[in-house]
C-alpha cells in the first residue's frame, strides 16, 4: 500500500477498510496536497455529522454545547496552536513502531483522561495527584518494558505494531472522541451518547491516517488547519456579527467541494490531452 492511489480520498478509503503501517514515499508537495484534500473531506463530513444534533432534538433528545466565557483571541490561540500539538502527542504520537513514542502517549493520555484512583484514601490533594501520576507512570513504563523484553527475545515490536495497526488506529480515534463528550450537556440513551462526538471520531480517523501515512507533523498540520478554519468562524462572529459567520460557513462548504473535485478535473483534462496527442 506504499503506492498512492489516483485520488487522496481513494487512498484514505482503502486505508479505512484495511489500515496498513506503511508510510507514503511521495515528496513534500504531494504530501501537502494529500493533507489539504483529506482535511477538506474532514470539514465536510464534520459539518454533515453536526446535523445529527437536529435529528436528536426532533427525536426528543437534547444536546447543548457547554458555554464557557473565554476571550475569543485566547480561545483561538488555544484551539489553533496549543490543542493540535498536545492532542496529537497524546493520542497519535504512539501510532508508530517506537516504544518511546508509545510510552509518552500512554503516560500523558492516562494521567489526563484515565480514572483517578483512591480518591477517598488521600486527604491531601497533592498526595492524591502525585500517587495517580506515579501509578500511571509505572503502568505505562511496564507496558513498554514488556514489549522491550519481547524484542530482546526476538519478537520485534515493529512486527506487533504492523499486525495490529488497525486496532491502534481505530482505538486511538475512539479515545480521541470520547473526552469531547465533556464539551456537551445531553439527554440521550446511553447507546446514543457517541452521536454528539461523531465529528471528533471522524476527525480522529482523519488525523490518524495523516499520522501513519504521512508522518507525525503532517497530522499536527492537518489538525491545526482543521481547527483554524472552524475557529475563524467564531472569531468573525465575535468581531463582525452573525452575518460574517454565515458567509464563512458558505466558504467552508464551497471551498472543500472544489478541492475534492480538483484532482478529478485535472485527471480528466490530462486524459483528454493524451487522446488529442494520440490522434495527431
Language model region names:
Residues 26, 56, 67-69, 180-185:
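Short amphipathic alpha-helical segments, especially helix-boundary/capping motifs
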